[in-house]
Amino acid sequence: MVKFTADELRAIMDCKHNIRNMSVIAHVDHGKSTLTDSLVAAAGIIAQEVAGDVRMTDTRADEAERGITIKSTGISLYYQMTDEALQSYKGERKGNDYLINLIDSPGHVDFSSEVTAALRITDGALVVVDCIEGVCVQTETVLRQALGERIRPVLTVNKMDRCFLELQVDGEEAYTTFQKVIENANVIMATYEDPLLGDVQVYPEKGTVAFSAGLHGWAFTLSNFAKMYASKFGVDESKMMERLWGENFFDPATKKWTTKNSGNASCKRGFVQFCYEPIKQIIAACMNDQKDKLLAHVTKLGIQMKTEEKDLMGRPLMKRVMQTWLPASSALLEMMIHHLPSPATAQRYRVENLYEGPMDDVYATAIRNCDPEGPLMLYVSKMIPASDKGRFFAFGRVFAGKVSTGMKVRIMGPNYVPGEKKDLYVKNVQRTVIWMGKKQETVEDVPCGNTVALVGLDQYITKNATLTNEKESDAHPIRAMKFSVSPVVRVAVQCKVASDLPKLVEGLKRLAKSDPMVVCSIEESGEHIIAGAGELHLEICLKDLQDDFMGGAEIIKSDPVVSFRETVLDRSVRTVMSKSPNKHNRLYMEARPMEEGLAEAIDEGRIGPRDDPKNRSKILAEEYGWDKDLAKKIWCFGPETTGPNMVVDMCKGVQYLNEIKDSVVAGFQWASKEGALAEENMRGICFEVCDVVLHTDAIHRGGGQIIPTARRVFYASQLTAKPRLLEPVYLVEIQAPENALGGIYSVLNQKRGHVFEEMQRPGTPLYNIKAYLPVVESFGFSSTLRASTSGQAFPQCVFDHWEMMPSDPLEAGSQASTLVSVIRKRKGLKEQMTPLSEFEDKL
């Protein structure tokens, strides 16, 4: 059944101009997996008749059961294009054979880390948008991620069959709906566009927008119709294509094109007249069983149908006719091949985003030229659990060189620093494998520009890594991925039977490997904590942990717990001072809140410890109103050296200051990771070292004296600066009909949420509601919401920002102070906070 073998696939891997690496991205339930099926069917991996129902790329049992994609799945497809299809193709190519490495990614926001992993190893993206629902929150998130990785998008307006069957809209109305959808997508693309990518917006008349119905397996771009009419009427194809979109009207009575509607009954817009109406007529003829009418249309359009197909009725008949006339695969493939870049093109502009080292060394050059003879550069973006329990494939993409079976590679983990031994391994690749949906084919080697799965490296890679040849000791790693969501929801897990503990520890290690986002840690109280992006994400992680990684051993999970952050509201009331244990050193300090937007800038990586100090002080001075000299005196960021807090040196002429800098920084990393209120991370606090008095003898000012003192003085300054708690807040988008709005508002009010935008979707009875909802209140939110709106409302939650809690945690009996004692109790600390007098000393 499969129309190609692994050897054919391997042969074409060398023609880097004939490869397309692309991912399918969209909002949840807009039909990614279903559309992918048509493409898979065209390559002959599944039968055409069942395409759309199999959802080939949903390989896990729970994916099929829930009807959502959870993990991104790769599949390599091989196509032979006809000469006429490639006539207008301008780029370089070798022959007519194309290899498309396609990755189907999840749409659900809890799994957006899977999307990031998929985008990193592809160059183009097919953005799927439901023609009725339009561009939603998640569409925007994934588009922003894609453009951030410099990935060129093409759009398909999916679920066209809804227009014909379910809603029965007329042509003009359909046209305005589609135009709105495309316009909304373009607005997002223009907002996040990158000057190096050029214009990334999509235009139907240029062939970068397709119209599809994934479930029925048909699709078209305007060029399909332009070709058809060009040969029929003998007009120029490109001219015809421009006429099929925009303000172009045709009146069959006068046989003239105009740019305005002349008002005659027969005068219709080009798109409606030549694309929408013919499809509508054929579908109507099929659904109403008007066989003779249908046959007339079919012969006119030159569709060849088998005799037994003519005996079908209703939907199956329509599906066959439409698939034969406008097969989804050819329209979408043509669009991908013409408008998405090959690795050779894409790596030229993506190298700056990918490679951490200097842009003129051997490695950067090899990536830029996509050179198979250069040194190996391979990025592993995720680990895929293999079918035999406990083993993992490392799934990634070769950016330069070749990776082959049995070769020795140098593995650089995410914490690797060039020139050091930390997080570095040299190991053998046992097998190189290419992925074909549910099965894998072993190949000898894989050259650059392709995706690959490697066997035998799973012990050394946690989530992602950079691989190069064993001798290349001066290679820098490829930049780590930025995730658009952060793990804010945590649960504690323990075994039901105490003897299963080793299984749990091992299982947690494997879980951390298999999911790009999840964080597993052990608290000081000995609890095992799993942190994820949301309720659904955690649910899937726990299911994987129990069934796959622990062999079904039972686990007990606590209620979900939310991470908080600690911050300050004002500058410290006074300069606080702490003395070292031997009373010979004194540190003076103040705390103040950071400027608006600065903490977010540090989170996004626009400002950080690795920046050039000149650039950094320029940004701080221009955007946040810092003093230029002050901006050069930032000692460090924290927690984890990159977090959104910092220490600034304000001292004037202090001796020996540099000697204690390291000790103060160490104390700061400790303090910022566990704040004074409830040992949660600090956020958005800027500490200013005002003065330091040190002992002249070096022996009296060692780390043992300074580190604890520094930590105490950080706590004291935090407590004198009106400390507050920050709680994480979700942005919730809800789609619902008008009669469900009352229920939505009441549920949101119970849960301390507030609505900030309500819009009616033009042309539909649905409303789009956006609201903020504290993560603490979000557990069970979707089930409560469905219950009170009788299942008509669908929420999507994305982590959005940190919101300050209004009450004062230092005031007994306030909401914040009860919350603090709850958190402290859970962590096994004293319920009462340590008072300020413990941290601050008097002269």
Curated annotation (Swiss-Prot):
Q: Which residues carry this modification: Diphthamide?
A: H700
EC nos: 3.6.5.-
Q: State the Pfam families in the record.
A: EFG_C, EFG_III, EFG_IV, GTP_EFTU, GTP_EFTU_D2
Record function comment: Catalyzes the GTP-dependent ribosomal translocation step during translation elongation. During this step, the ribosome changes from the pre-translocational (PRE) to the post-translocational (POST) state as the newly formed A-site-bound peptidyl-tRNA and P-site-bound deacylated tRNA move to the P and E sites, respectively. Catalyzes the coordinated movement of the two tRNA molecules, the mRNA and conformational changes in the ribosome.
Q: Which family does it belong to?
A: Belongs to the TRAFAC class translation factor GTPase superfamily. Classic translation factor GTPase family. EF-G/EF-2 subfamily.
Keyword Phosphoprotein: yes or no?
yes
Q: Which PROSITE patterns match?
A: G_TR_1 (PS00301), G_TR_2 (PS51722)
Which residue ranges does the record assign to the tr-type G domain? 17-253
| Modifications the protein undergoes after translation, according to the UniProt entry | Phosphorylation by EF-2 kinase completely inactivates EF-2.
In-chain residues carrying the UniProt-annotated modification Phosphothreonine: T57, T59
User: SUPFAM superfamilies from the entry?
Assistant: EF-G C-terminal domain-like, P-loop containing nucleoside triphosphate hydrolases, Ribosomal protein S5 domain 2-like, Translation proteins
Q: Which domain of life is it from?
A: Eukaryota
This chain belongs to the protein called: Elongation factor 2
What do the Gene Ontology cellular component annotations say?
A: cytosol; ribonucleoprotein complex
Q: What is its main location?
A: cytoplasm
- Which SMART domains does the entry mention? EFG_C, EFG_IV
| Keywords, alphabetical | Cytoplasm, Elongation factor, GTP-binding, Hydrolase, Nucleotide-binding, Phosphoprotein, Protein biosynthesis
Q: Does the keyword Nucleotide-binding apply?
A: yes
Localization annotation? Cytoplasm
* Catalysed reactions, semicolon-separated: GTP + H2O = GDP + phosphate + H(+)
What would be an example GO MF term here?
A: GTP binding
Q: What is the lineage of its organism?
A: Eukaryota, Viridiplantae, Streptophyta, Embryophyta, Tracheophyta
- Binding positions (GTP): A26, H27, V28, D29, H30, G31, K32, S33, N158, K159, M160, D161
